[in-house]
Amino acid sequence: MSIKYLMLLFAAMIIRSLADSGNAIETTSPEITNATTDIPAIRLCGPEGDGYCLHGDCIHARDIDGMYCRCSHGYTGIRCQHVVLVDYQRSGKPDTTTSYIPSLGIVLVLVGIIITCCLLSVYMFTRRTKLPIQDMVVLYFL
């Protein structure tokens, strides 16, 4: 991993934690003492950020100077300029190799049960009739 990617990841984690915390800043003035004013942790850039992010929203963080991009789904990069390849995205479609494996297992178990039942019926028939298996094979093919 490159250092730029690590820095971007760290900045995104800081921005996300600031957005989730919603801290208030204490201010004092001659008229009002210890009042709290809510300043949003993240706000949109406004007109100065138009066109900065190619596929996403331009944002300002309260504790970090500069503009940052919140990328739309399917895009990544500092300015959301890179398309995420389909191979790396998690898609809702199941993988074709894993979707038929349970069906194949059930079919194999059923075939095994059918073969076992056939062998048991042949065995019971030979015990009941006291015919050797060679004679029974001749009877089946006549």
From Swiss-Prot:
Cytoplasmic side: 126-142
Family under the similarity heading: Belongs to the orthopoxvirus OPG019 family.
Cellular component per GO, a single term: host cell membrane
GO molecular function list: epidermal growth factor receptor binding; growth factor activity
Key words of the record: Disulfide bond, Early protein, EGF-like domain, Glycoprotein, Growth factor, Host membrane, Host-virus interaction, Membrane, Secreted, Signal, Transmembrane, Transmembrane helix
Post-translational modification: Cleaved at the cell surface by host ADAM10, thereby releasing the secreted form of VGF.
Residue runs in coiled coils: none
Sites carrying sugar chains: 34
Factors inducing expression: Expressed in the early phase of the viral replicative cycle.
Gene Ontology biological process terms, A to Z: epidermal growth factor receptor signaling pathway; positive regulation of cell population proliferation; positive regulation of mitotic nuclear division
UniProt site positions, description: Cleavage (By host ADAM10 protease): 96-97
Official protein name in the record: Pro-Viral epidermal growth factor
Annotated signal peptide: 1-19
Annotated TM spans: 105-125
Extracellular membrane side: 20-104
PANTHER family named among the record's database cross-references: PROEPIREGULIN (PTHR10740:SF11), TRANSFORMING GROWTH FACTOR ALPHA (PTHR10740)
UniProt cross-references to Gene3D superfamilies, sorted A to Z: Laminin
Cystine pairings recorded for this chain: 71-80
Protein's organism: Monkeypox virus
